[in-house]
Amino acid sequence: MGDNKNNYFDVIIIGSGSIGAPTALFLAQEGIKTLVIDKFPSVGQGSAKRAIGGIRATHSDPAKVRLCLRSIELFSQWQELYGDDIDWYKGGYTFVAYREEEEKTLKALIHKQKSLGLNINWLDKNDFLEVVPDINP
């Protein structure tokens, strides 16, 4: 029957989106035999394709924050590391507080996110208009 050694994998990843594909890449770089299974015919065709292409680390879960910070670091250096121009653009995200309760929640979250290494700030209306002057308040 031959050598079955090649029929086994150390890790099987379900999904080739924004989590599965880079996880497989890093595991393979470490010499870990990895298989990626996805219902779509090519990488990134599920929810990753429907995203706007941004990567944000503004989460409440510390593990997600760390993962996204690492993703930002990786994608910002992708061309230097792998030679492919992925049209990386360093942008930003804005979350608007329409009510006092939302403002309180977001301000509390900012402290947590800063403690995890995020470069994040609270902008009042005037500060925001300086950053994005063409917005219609």
Question: Each PLM stretch: what is its role?
Answer:
Residues Y8-F9, G31-I32, G91, L118:
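Short coil/turn connectors at secondary-structure junctions
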Residues A28-A48:
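Glycine-rich FAD pyrophosphate-binding loop
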Residues I52-V131:
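Dinucleotide-binding Rossmann-like beta1-alpha1 core, especially the glycine-rich loop
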Residues D134-P137:
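Short, intrinsically disordered, charge-balanced linker/junction segments flanking boundaries
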